[in-house]
Amino acid sequence: MKYDTVVIGAGLGGLMAALSAAERGKKTLVVSKGMGIITIFSGTIDILGYYPVQDSAPLSSPREGVERLIAEDPNHPYARVGLEALEEGMSFFQDAVAREGVTYVGSLDRNFLAPTAVGTVKPTAFLSKSMEAGDVREESDVLIAGFRGLKDFYPAYMAHNISTSRVSGISIPHFRGRILDVDIGADHSGMSALTLARKMEEDDMIQTVGRALFRQVRDGERVALPAVLGIRSGDDVFRRLEDMAGTRIFETPTLPPSVTGYRLYRALERRVRAAGIRLLIGYDVHDPEVARGRVGAVSISMGKKTKRIEGDAFVLATGGLVGRGVITDRKSTQEPIFGLPVTGPSKRSEWFTERFFDPAGHPINRIGLTVDDQLRPVDDTDKPVYKNLFACGAQLAGYDALREKSGGGVTIASGFKAGRLAGEL
């Protein structure tokens, strides 16, 4: 089989790359072992929450932070991608998911300060419309409403932690936690957020929860609910509940697996298929065929079944250490498909600093592929290993998504740009 663009990896970066290439009229394939960690992450899109990373105060403006970062760190993925591609990529992303019924709000000019299920405050630039009312800078108090039998969401615990949090320059409103008098049908082992989200698409459940909220909420309060307001969208369910409760409602992402991440993945998957992109999940990718500085084909296999896939351009979006796009053993760190050079500490003893909560982060979090301004992986002489192979997402070296709170922005921007560049070949 022959394609114009072959994207390896079906996470956020891979799907963005595929959509970007397809927009340029390219026959595109996405092939992956699995769905990527997008299905377990919070669903918020972090652009830049902290810079420098040692700062304890979150950035007010991601744009200003990115501009400064690009000027000071030319090896950071944002410097390779550029601010223009970040802006275009985020607009492209918002349009893609909106077409599938999932609305994302936000901008590069202002971070939200969103509460988390464990009671911390997280800076993030873009989030689902169903989370918009949760910014802790708003003065109105918050009722955290939970469900008896729902796993991993504890309103009293969240309320206590967030009410005692300290965020520089911010006065956090009062949070109180309550369990709603609603039978969700959980058995003795409890119910997952995904299961409850499916139930929340039923009219009877929406009516029951709406009435329970109306009885609990006080004048002037907002309501925080676990992110269980439907699998497909979330927008319609939360609007109906707002009407019934008579106040603003927002979702709070639960611990993994997260409904908001799953919802986002399904929206992107629908958009990918609508764009005519072929999506193959469950395949190993191996045995690349290379000649004269270019990748000509790869083999993909499921069990004993193997296929040869030719392509004019290839985008590698297999993730970092968590996604196994970079793997390690006791002696080395490798990129497993193409054998690309990996940038990072050569010794395991250098992966971590002595302080577990080191404000500067740990070197292992910056491991990945070094790329040029065209997002092509380079060798130790800074020359592209293959002229038609691009990389994006968590696989890139030189940034610490955990400390910077930059993972979503880097992934979307680099995926968008990699797909565009691949589509130009």
Feature locations, PLM:
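Residues forming the flavin
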Residues: 1-79, 84-87, 95-425
